[in-house]
Amino acid sequence: MRSGYTLPVFACAGAIAALHWLRQRQSIQVALVDLIEPAQIAEVPIEQVAGLSANMALAITRSDPGDNLDLTKNTPIWAVVEWGKTGGEQVTIKGGEGIGKQVNADNQAAIYSYAQRLLQANLTRLLAPEESIIVTIILPEGRSLAVRTSNSAFGVVEGLSLLGTTGISQPLSSPDQLDAFRSELQHKASLYESLVFCIGENGLDLARKIGINAEKLVKTANWLGPMLVEADALGVKEILLFGYHGKLMKLAGGIFHTHHHLADGRREVLATHCALAGLSKQDIEIVFHSPTAEAALKHLKALDISTGNDWVNQVYSAIAETIDSRCQEYMQSHSSRGTAATICGSILFDRDRKIIVKSKTACNLMGNLC
């Protein structure tokens, strides 16, 4: 299956093409982008370039994520570049229409660290020391596409995120991609005894921000079961599962491939642990019928405020412990190492990227991962 590039790469290519027009008053058909991660140069087709004024230009590219079931496939990405004030910040990056806003970060544009680095690195080298530019990224279809994503669950509204830790987009649901994840795991298992599994980019990004060693992070996508078994077979001593609660809690129900097309079980896991914690029948029913895990968490938080109880901690601590024990059982059932099987801990975070709970094992593992 063919890989492609992530959205930040196309945004950067458009900005390079628009800046070229400002300098040369000429269009280019291909922009060369240094991906940084990985260390390679991408040749990105430019669909259109136009001067909007003497000091402003627009370039358009189209997303090509490869053979990936990605809703951004073929969506246009616009980059508007204008000259800034002499002596100002060399590259100022803004989010325009269709770029999401982070509701818990003063509505900042959802242009995350890799995209920022990519744009800064590629554009700064094209500027003289005294020059500065303002780059505005626009996704004309971003607002409508965002409705079909889980962005709002992570506090991003009104558009898509320029998210990612690499310039390469891989087909995450394909067996070939599992092979790629296993290959990365095999490499890191040869270097470290303790590793962190993250399902997606939000986990990878937050893990770095709380001080976890980036070299110990391994992306799993939805393939948690096979990756846990592989880690155990490789002799990894400790695995920390670090992820969004709406994904990781599925493991507490014995679901080890977390794609929603295969199985869900979130409301059953939540309602069961609420019942075990002693919530009222009425509150258990509200949790069970909540449309999302985030809505259920919101109800538990409201209960804590109104009653002075600590239901969030009680329920989620129990879920985290169940995740740990289910993972241990799963690995041991596939392991030839017996009681020496890999130790597993879990950390769950919410849509605001705030940690809800760390299991007891996770707390013990953290010292080996930072």
Curated annotation (Swiss-Prot):
InterPro entries assigned to the protein according to its UniProt record, in alphabetical order: CbiD, CbiD_sf
GO molecular function: cobalt-precorrin-5B C1-methyltransferase activity
SUPFAM superfamilies: CbiD-like (SSF111342)
This protein's pathway: Cofactor biosynthesis; adenosylcobalamin biosynthesis; cob(II)yrinate a,c-diamide from sirohydrochlorin (anaerobic route): step 6/10
Keyword match S-adenosyl-L-methionine: yes
Xref: Pfam families: CbiD (PF01888)
Reaction catalysis annotation: Co-precorrin-5B + S-adenosyl-L-methionine = Co-precorrin-6A + S-adenosyl-L-homocysteine
Record's keyword terms, sorted: Cobalamin biosynthesis, Methyltransferase, S-adenosyl-L-methionine, Transferase
Source superkingdom: Bacteria
EC numbers on record: 2.1.1.195
GO BP field: anaerobic cobalamin biosynthetic process; methylation
Record family assignment: Belongs to the CbiD family.
NCBIfam families for the chain: cbiD
Name recorded for this polypeptide: Cobalt-precorrin-5B C(1)-methyltransferase
Native organism: Nostoc sp. (strain PCC 7120 / SAG 25.82 / UTEX 2576)
